[in-house]
Amino acid sequence: MKFQLHCRDHEARRGTLTLAHGTVETPAFMPVGTYGAVKGLSPDELHTLGAGIILGNTFHLWLRPGLEVIGAHGGLHRLMNWDGPILTDSGGFQVFSLGALRKICEEGVRFRSPVNGDTCFLTPEESMRIQQVLNSDIVMIFDECTPYPVDMQIAESSMQLSLRWAERSKTAHAGNPNALFGIVQGGMYESLRDHSAAGLCAIGFDGYAIGGLSVGEPKADMQRILRHTAPQLPADKPRYLMGVGTPEDIVHAVAQGIDLFDCVLPTRNARNGWLYTSQGILRLRNSRYRLDTSPPDEHCDCYTCRHFTRAYLHHLQRTGEMLGARLNSLHNLHYYQRLMANIRKAIETGQFEQFARKFSGQDFMLKCASV
């Protein structure tokens, strides 16, 4: 892996990330393909949209289709016929999401499979082995996602466990030529975030992620922790904010020096009939669009906006036609990829601060509420 920074505009960074399966222009947004597919879209469509890297989920792919199937294809790229880079989450967040179904100990996490009820045991070593079979371009360490809300004592214990698992992850990753990223934890406590970041930097990783955010905390707390944590990470390594977020969240995080993002919002909201547009969020189920023959966004050149009207998409949403979810997903992911391209251009030209004003504060939120 090679990461090259080309320029900055204050803390916002413009770079290039070179990985085994290709080059990623940063800041970049990674569409989420949890089960080895971005819901409803083909790899060719993702390329056309401008996606340079996608995300897969170790936990879910381990359970289905399983390592035997993935290994028979020679890895996740050939299984899903995607020739670009792939980042895989380690499974820590998904195990955290199981709640009472899982039991955490020093060695790892024991849980009941949500697929068939079998008892499973996931450790840092097993997570690294799975991701090696997947042949992920970027491998994430196995960590415990600190719950929210939680008191400082529990958050510290969780953070320390994640640091010990980080060391084990790096040891188990030895010999794998693909990149390995550490994950900063520590909940909503700045001092714990400092300790986590320092510990990970001492171990040494190819890149660093900020985890444990967008887990139910108020946005003000998320932004506070992000502002505090990002400067603690090495300037010459890529920085990844996990699971975030809205267009406004992304622009705010780029201003703090973040390079990589992933989130299910564009595709999940697409399936629910929410489209991101230059005028804010368009809610297709609203009856006001029943006779609206205008495109979803007059300023968008995606396939959906060039070929279909709001009235037709409203009809598809109301009738539950799968074409509607596909067309909406094409539009939303195009919106996100265009947003990232515009961010990169703004940084290159020294105009990022002006660009960010369009997505900050009350003006953008009023647009979202009124379209």
Curated annotation (Swiss-Prot):
Protein name: Queuine tRNA-ribosyltransferase
Keyword Transferase in annotation: yes
Catalytic activity, as annotated: 7-aminomethyl-7-carbaguanine + guanosine(34) in tRNA = 7-aminomethyl-7-carbaguanosine(34) in tRNA + guanine
InterPro entries: ArchSynthase1/Queuine_TRR, TGT, TGT-like_sf, tRNA_ribo_trans-like
Binding residues annotated for Zn(2+), in chain numbering: 300, 302, 305, 331
Binding-site residues, substrate: 89-93, 143, 185, 212
Source organism: Nitrosomonas europaea (strain ATCC 19718 / CIP 103999 / KCTC 2705 / NBRC 14298)
An example Gene Ontology biological process: tRNA wobble guanine modification
